[in-house]
């Protein structure tokens, strides 16, 4: 209920028309997505780009021209602490003033009668991959890398990008199951 109320408050204050959504690998991302949908009205288009690293959000906002972004993540905390991070259209965490306004407004907020729907959209994966591949001012071709994916959101994309630019890559903690992010 809190997440839905925060989203309704954000809509009332910031009036976004399009929102980029990315998630981590935790199973709770699905239920949190539904709470986000309940909080925004049908006037807000939410595009779910799926499991991507948090650092991809500024790229998505810039490349795909969204009004704001939402990241579902517990960062480096256990799964039970999964929640949302609100990101402004410039790719920065929503300023504390905006957070304070939405918190003050939450007591009076009513959830919309017609929820927004979340559309799955996979262009974000390719946009992020293209951006990472465009970083070519460092020559990694003589590097052997060990990458700890922490069973998190980087587990999939890293194995597509890194082998192309390094001599040898070994990836560990790459078997996410929805509950083991940041575990060995």
Per-range role (PLM):
Residues 18-81, 161-184:
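N-terminal small/polar loop signature for handling phosphorylated ligands or for N-terminal nucleophile
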Residues 2-3, 65:
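Generic hydrophobic secondary-structure packing signal
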Residues 10, 57-60, 135-136:
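Short, flexible, glycine/charge-rich loop motifs used to bind or transfer phosphoryl groups or to couple energy/partner
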Residues 16-19, 142-144:
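Nucleotide donor/acceptor-binding cores
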Residues 2, 8, 82-184:
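Gly/Ser/Thr-enriched, mixed-charge loops and adjacent short helices
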